[in-house]
Amino acid sequence: MNAVAPISVRVNPNVDANTHPYISTGLAENKFGVDADVALSMYKKAALSDSLKVCGLDYHIGSQITEIAPFIEALERALELVEKLKSENILVEHLDIGGGVGVSYDDEKIINIEDYLNSVTNRAKEMKILVEPGRSIVANAGIFVTRVEYLKRNNLKSFAIVDGAMNDLIRPSLYESFHQAVLIDDNSIGINDNWDIVGPVCESADFLAKNRNLTLEKGDYIAIMTAGAYGFVLSSNYNSRPRVPEVMISGKQHSLVRKRETIESLFENESLFEDGTNQ
């Protein structure tokens, strides 16, 4: 075929992103990438091959990062490897710095993206820079709307049991992450209390928010904010719950872009085991 395949190597720069450990991907203890010495050896072997062309160096140190320092530390370690490659006459055309820029879920101070990119381009000079933004683009473009089904109070806790659950938005259960919970109609005449907003799934990890001061009554709608990233894509059919629909809004226009699943759709790809007894 005489094809020449372009290659990039994902390097693990061993940098602590100071984020939740489940979404840290740039430490030596994480499963991603190879260390700089291994990468150097890989590049040398690739440079000797007639079927491979070295074109880039990649890294990604994690997600929901709210400080610029880890990004710069990772960049500088990557550029050290680029210089070593130059000394071996191996030229890297692009540097893929991944994504990871965090957003504000709970009034966190976040990175100024312009300052971050200026820091990158000032250091990387004439290299082509690839960036993989995700959360920083879509997180605040989505909200999860859920309805209060029941209010339940005991001597210790007050629960707002809603129709949404951990299968719909698992981030609070998986990462103990914080999402703002906003009452859509702020004229509710219900009960004011500090509510745990919980779903109907059969485990205590099923919560969307805890200890939120709201005035609620049955039938109220609550908006769980900043749900556009790692929301629907992490949803499941746990407890045989059909996934929710998605509605896109633009100005005063709205359109159903993903219809609600049905109980029937949960089983449409299943079939009986054909062992001769169910003929």
What is each of the regions a protein language model found here?
Residues R77-L81, E88-D96, V101-I143, E149-Y150:
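Glycine-rich phosphate/ribose-binding loops and adjacent secondary-structure elements
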Residues V11-V15, I61-I65, G99-V103, R135-I137, ...:
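Glycine-rich beta-alpha junction loops
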Residues N2-A3, L48, S87-E88, I110, ...:
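Short, glycine- and charge-enriched coil/turn segments that flank and shape catalytic ligand pockets
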Residues M1-H94, V103, S119:
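Active-site-proximal beta-alpha core segment in soluble small-molecule metabolic enzymes
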Residues V34-D37, S41, A69, E73-E76, ...:
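Conserved active-site and cofactor/substrate-binding residues in soluble primary-metabolism enzymes
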Residues Y22, E29, L52, D58, ...:
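Short glycine- and Lys/Arg-enriched binding-loop motifs that mark or flank ligand-binding interfaces
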Residues S119, E126-Q279:
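Charged (often Lys/Glu-rich) extended helix/loop segments that serve as interaction or gating elements
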Residues A17-S24, I68-P70, Y105-I110, N140-F144, ...:
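Short acidic, glycine/serine/threonine-rich loops at helix termini
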